[in-house]
Amino acid sequence: GVNALNAYISKGHVPNDYVEYAKKDGEGIVRPDLLLTLAELFNEVTEDLEKMGLVILKDENGEYVTRGWRNVKINGENIKPLLADAVSSLENVKVFNQVNITDLKLGIRDGKKAVVGAVGFGVRKKEIYDIDADAVIIATGGAAGLYRPNNPGFSRHKMWYSPFNTGAGFAMGLRAGAEMTTFENRFVALRCKDTIAPTGTIAQGVGAKQVNANGEIYEQKYGITTPQRIYGTVEENRQGKGPCYLKTSGITDKQEDELYKAYLNMAPSQTLKWIEEGRGPKAKDVEIEGTEPYIVGGHTASGYWVDTHRQSTVSGLFAAGDVAGGAPQKYVTGALAEGKIAGESALDYVKKVGVIQEMSAQEWMQEYQRHFEKSHSMMTWEDVEEAMQKVMDEYAGGIAMGYRYNEARLEVAREKIKNLQAQVENLFAKDMFDLLHIYEVRERLLVCEVLIEHLFARKETRWHIFGENADYPEKDQAFDGYINSKIVDGKVEIVFRDLVGGHYEHTN
């Protein structure tokens, strides 16, 4: 669950205030048109959530209790069941559970290429799904599991971003010819060490400052934007001044009790750790660390290049949430707002378009079957995934390298990822669950391939940690623009686009 809605326009503020905040945090590489259309809907979707049954904390005057000017406090441990119930109650919506969608179907519509459906397979049963659609909305989230995570072995999925978000939405869009943006702005979360629990609740809830092992407050030294907070922590550790902490020692009993409750709602392992150690945050500062990098549009603007209506560069294909690029700092309400925009735009689209000439799903069915017909391969999907994460960690700016990368290392990463992609073709699946894992690795490897080209292309360090280029350690105004990508004839092609000022529509 979550304990706050982090995107809300409180009294005394207007949507454009949020645009400016996100623009500053993203060092200018954002889409103001997308941000504004989201911010205009934040409060509306917040009220929708409350009507669904979400408990939003209120003061004695019946006003929402805010945490800063853009956050609203909630009791959000049940937010996902509430949303799932809302979807399942709709008469005209059919939900297919335990189905893995792998590819988009392409056809010709009104004389140009268009997405006309999707294909996938059942995870439990040997079933192929061939779905026709007048329009498709991708809302699959971003990509986790590209880099070696903080914790090894059994605990490797104790991570910030859901391990089930494999980048599949990015991958199927790329294969369909859709343009992506800003993958080079990776997201690294500042978290409580080992539990990977959120730190914002402590920093904002009790005003805890970031301190090094000597007790020195260092956050003002490096800056307080999202990447700067992590950059400071990495630098202090690199200089031998770690471990680093959030200074909670000395907080009141009431504040400690509130932290126990808050973490039980969203990250129980943190509260359990305090109890197990016999010392809570009042007695001991909370150690912090950065996670491995993720590709997540809701935080760092990486994802599909969309117009103001959230349509991608391929006709009939829309994107919303973490998979959609251009608009960082979305959080829950931003994702819901974007879903609303994409849904309404898709409805308008299907009313206007003409006859479809579509392609068969037969080729994908044959591809699924091929993995069952392979002889037992020398590598398993798990071997390939582990090798991929090691490559990205060591050669594409992971935790091991302090998030830094250079062109020489990226060259190695490019070659090794290509070799691993070839290995995936030969993987053997013993059942449908195995096939699912093979496809998850396939999606991640394609996202890695595209990410590496983005890291090559931005020859500057615009965002510390998120894009820490050791060859080009300074910000360069020559890169005041978007770095986009698409796949042309099987190869990643980089596209440089100028910054968008007002309303944007696709023209090429």
Question: Whereabouts are the PLM-identified features?
Answer:
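Conserved N-terminal glycine-rich FAD pyrophosphate-binding loop of Rossmann-like flavoproteins
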Residues: 1-21, 200-202
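Dinucleotide-binding Rossmann-like beta1-alpha1 core, especially the glycine-rich loop
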Residues: 21-43, 69-70
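Mobile, glycine/GP-rich and aromatic-enriched active-site lid/loop segments adjacent to catalytic centers
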Residues: 43, 50-105, 114, 182-331, ...
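Core beta-strand elements of the Rossmann-like FAD/NAD(P) dinucleotide-binding domain
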Residues: 125-135, 313
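Short, well-ordered coil/turn residues at beta-beta hairpins
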Residues: 133-135, 139-140, 320-321, 454
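Glycine-rich loop(s) and the adjacent beta-strand/alpha-helix scaffold that form part
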Residues: 138-197, 332-345
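Catalytic phosphate/nucleotide-handling subdomain of diverse soluble enzymes
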Residues: 312-372
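Long, amphipathic alpha-helical stalk/connector segments used for oligomerization, subunit docking
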Residues: 351-432
